[in-house]
C-alpha cells in the first residue's frame, strides 16, 4: 500500500505516457475516478472505465495522443502531498502555464478544475496540475 495513492496514480499515468502505452490501469477509488473524469472533460485523456476484476476495482485510463504520436499531457504533477498540504482561497488559485493547463482541486462541492472553482467562488486543496 502506498502512502499517497493520488501520487501513485499520477506516476502511473506519467510512466505510461513516456512508454507510449494506449492505456494504464490504476487501483480504483472515488477520488481517482473524479480526477479521471476531469481529465476526460478537459480533453487530456480519451476515456476511462471503472472495472471490477474479482474483489478489486481498477480504473482503466485510455491515454490520448496527437496525430504525430506526441502525448496530449506534457506534464502532470502532484501539488498537495500528505506531508505538505496546499490549500488556496478562491482569489489565490494559481494559473498553470498562463491558462494553458489546469489545476485540479478538491472543494466542499467536490473535485473540480481551478477555473470552475474560481467561477463558483470556492477554494480548496490543490491536488495536482496538468499541462
Curated annotation (Swiss-Prot):
Q: Which PROSITE patterns match?
A: RIBOSOMAL_S8 (PS00053)
InterPro entries, per this entry? Answer: Ribosomal_uS8 (IPR000630), Ribosomal_uS8_CS (IPR047863), Ribosomal_uS8_sf (IPR035987)
Q: Which GO terms describe its biological process?
A: translation
Q: Highest taxon of the source?
A: Bacteria
Enumerate the GO terms in the molecular function aspect: rRNA binding; structural constituent of ribosome
Q: Does the keyword RNA-binding apply?
A: yes
Instruction: Note the Gene3D superfamilies from the entry.
Output: 3.30.1370.30, 3.30.1490.10
* Cellular component annotations (GO), alphabetically ordered: ribonucleoprotein complex; ribosome
Record-linked SUPFAM superfamilies: Ribosomal protein S8
The alphabetical list of record keywords is: Ribonucleoprotein, Ribosomal protein, RNA-binding, rRNA-binding
Per the record, the similarity remark reads: Belongs to the universal ribosomal protein uS8 family.
UniProt subunit comment: Part of the 30S ribosomal subunit. Contacts proteins S5 and S12.
Role played: One of the primary rRNA binding proteins, it binds directly to 16S rRNA central domain where it helps coordinate assembly of the platform of the 30S subunit.
Give the protein name, as stated in the record: Small ribosomal subunit protein uS8
